[in-house]
Amino acid sequence: MKPVEKMFSEKGSWFKGNLHSHTVNSDGRLTPAQSAAYYREHGYSFICFSEHDYYTDLRKILDRDDFIILPGLEASTYLITSDDFSGLFEPEVLQRGYCDMTFQELMAFRNKNVNFTLKKAHHIHGILGTKEMRAAAGENVFTVNQLYPIRIYLNQWDGVNAAQTLSDSLKQKGCFTTYNHPIWSRVDIEDVRDLQGVWAIECYNYDTVNECAEGEDTVFWDTMLRHGTDISCFASDDNHNGGTF
């Protein structure tokens, strides 16, 4: 029997990190300091606190020589459907077909109005990029503790255009982008296949594996590559601190 080849070279420097996690700054259960301590204790070298639609930069507080924080956020756009949106939105919004909300406004809307269905979602990371990326963003670069608006599409959308618009807007703020958990988000391959300029797709999401057995997204990555889309992949735990580490 041929021995299994090693997946990684023994040469060079290798670091373990997590690009997708949440704390009490969105819907996680631990503080950033508690979460950072847990990851350090388990041999990680870096983490991105990717709060929902809320950019944070905790480098000055939590960075260490052996553990670094990647500033970022998990930004969202949604397609919602209803037989009748009249009375829920202003006429100009209904005519335009979309509106922007903060995360808090969306939650209040959801709790108040039950006559709609959340049909699809795009969750895209913006992770603060290189000096060159930040310089190109100029005054648009993200500031600390910044809420990011959520675009809500009513009854229909051009899926790939919605995702491209969100990714491009994050890049204009000095970030590189990733596309997260497409199966959990209920998107079709046509909604993401032609995305351009996205660094990587999340091909494995451990949290959604545990939640609903829908965290293995390699079919999306493979289809995008077959179609000629230039995109890498990554795996994450999407930790919300809900159980034993």
Where are these regions (language model features)?
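A metal-dependent hydrolase metal-coordination microenvironment
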Residues: 2-176, 180, 187, 194, ...
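Substrate-binding cleft/loops of secretory-pathway carbohydrate-active enzymes
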Residues: 186-199, 241-245
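Short acidic/histidine-rich active-site segments
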Residues: 229-245
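N-terminal acidic, glycine/proline-rich low-complexity segments
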Residues: 223-226
